[in-house]
Amino acid sequence: MPLTYIGGDLVLTNNRSLQRLNGFGSLKHLGGNVSILDNGAIPEEPSDDNVIGFCKIKYYEMAGILDEEATVQLGRSTSLIDFNSLSPCPYEVVEDISGTFKAVPANRFLNSIGMNTSINSRGENVNTTEEIMRYLGARWIRTSVGGSVSSLTNLPETSLPGAGTSIASYKQLYDNAGIRFSAGLGAGGQERNIPNLINNVKRIIDATSPDAIIAIEGNNEPNNRNWYVIFEGEVGGGNKEGKNNWKPVARMQKKLYEDVKADPVLGKDGYNYPVWSLTDGGASGENVGLQYLKVPEDDMAVPEEFRGVTFADVANLHNYFNHPSFKFPQNNQTWRAAEPSTNVPPGCDVLYRHFGVTWLNKYKGYLTDEELEALPRVTTETGSTISDAVTEEMQGLLYMSLYLAQFAQGFDYTAMYLLTDRRDESGNQSFGFYDKFYNPRQSAHYLHNLTTILKDDKDIDEPGELTYSITGRTITVHDLLLQKNNGTFELVIWGEKYEGGSDRITVGFDQTYDEVWVYNPTKGTAPEMVLNNVNSIELDISNHPYIIEIGEHPESSVEDMKNDDFQIRAFPNPVIRNLTIYSDTEIGKVSLFDMMGNCVYTGRVYDKVYTVDMDNLPAGAYILSVLDESGNCIKKQKVIKS
């Protein structure tokens, strides 16, 4: 339990191991005096918006947690800090907002939500990929169709489930679920990979629609391990002989851009798909200008060969929010990772470190806030494994916040790494919304709830404006005004106070609304509150979103939404080990029958999520039967055990 109440004095003396004041983030009352002397490295002034130092005590005074008459001694017994001169920690400073704000189409936010997945290979199954993408409400997949240094990607026309990604795999996902794709060169490669990629993209378009492709992407992390490139016989990037020779990497990206733009289908005379930059350009071993989308003609630090060259239309990042140099928990963890300006959080792999001043060798690119914030930008990898610090619950909260923070700060697309855990490599076994047996994690349910509440299928023609204020807003409270195509406003307000505590805010409106619905995606898809004749709402904001809905609401009543929405999903299918059943209503009983009608499994549930262990059942076909609490059959489905 977090520490919330101290009735008397707070005395911390001669504790050399004490670092910061992280354990006091949730304190609501401090009844006595404060003496913190001769301790460890407690910062006097914070260097960023996360450090909990003596500024926390100043906040206690400002917020009334500490009596203004209390005696405060901080620092060293021989050299006290002037408490009166301290400022509150930046993340505690109240920054109220008030005004009339223009909405962004809700559909545009939903379109930004993407995944990294192998679709129908590496142990993944296209049928289940479709099912779980639908459940999550994710709209696009980052895919590689170029090949590698040693091989080309040859997409067959068709393939069996789990037997490799084919043109038919892309067609199934697009035709059935509207899923779109970015198409990348992949990790490593040679110049021959470029025409291979272009050909595969055109085959996908022929089988689906021009709308199925979002963009063409450059090489994946050419600084990494063996993901070097060979261009015209010369090795560049990676960690071998090309480590400090990035000219082949730049030439590869330059040729990709030129060939895509010159192609009659993909290029300027065709659908003119944007080209995304390669990733981790901030690790360039030499200054070849990859810190620019288009290299200025007058940047004499870049070789003449690359001056004036256009490498990409869009900046592409792998700005992981949980990184060895930016570890969880920190307040504003995902918000700071999405920072688009020169205000660089310590240790965070942000836009500036790849397109401002590169993190490895300090090559200079875009140096002003205006230049950086104007860059079109996407993220094609980010995420976090589960650990002692990042629990499954916390991962779910972070993933929701990540998509919101990225979009609110100008990222058009964000792909999480990963849709499901890898089955063929170590170290990546808990990134996924699903584990390798397709069991959903909390992150899957939370994202499902968020996208279901915001569900929309097209952009509103002319987004409207909403007048509102947020009082009591601190630096960890964020807002995003969305609007559905039917005119309904969805005001998303979320917090990133991951070190504990909450902020009581008041959302005020310039008029009284007959009915306002307030959703909490951690609780489900039905409104947590339905308020009538309201012009203000009080909320405690901590580490998850609330969604305030103004306008048209779902036609069903709240009670109907809770009890009459019989959407039952069972996946994966085919199943390897565990079959997970998720329902929007309470399940009473689950049974499995073989094809002879024999009951081979039955279980009482009384919950919305249930897992059937099919590991010991023979391979073959089974009939799944799901009953509600009253014994009514609400689902029958054929299930294949592989």
Descriptions of predicted regions:
Residues 129-131, 142-212, 238-277:
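Aromatic-lined substrate-binding rim segments of carbohydrate-active enzymes
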Residues 5-18, 31-42, 53-78:
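Concave beta-strand-loop units of leucine-rich repeat
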Residues 83-147:
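Boundary/entry segment of secreted carbohydrate-active catalytic domains
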Residues 467-514:
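Carbohydrate-binding surface patches
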